[in-house]
Amino acid sequence: MIQLTVLYGQPHDPAAFDRHYQQTHAVLAQKIPGLKGYVTNKPAALNPQEPSPYYFIADLYFENLAAMQAALQSPEGQAAAGDLQNFATGGATLVAGEVQVYHPVSFG
């Protein structure tokens, strides 16, 4: 399983970021073929004197590296990537890696 993590920097307008992400970007991302899972979070700063460099984090899961690459090159993947310029005013850093499970997560 491959996890693609998108780290979004602090946006110029957080309310506009939230609105666009929820109403447009998440809808586009959910259409990416081969997507096995998709979760997001807003990280809290662990030290109040040092705010988090990231406003928002998205994790997308794919079966393997080839599936992720194919998904990102698909029309749906390209649409989601192209949408970043419409709301990610604080920048977006993408990293990917093989998932190692030490203790399974249970949502719900």
List each model region and its residues:
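Macromolecular interaction modules
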Residues: 1-108
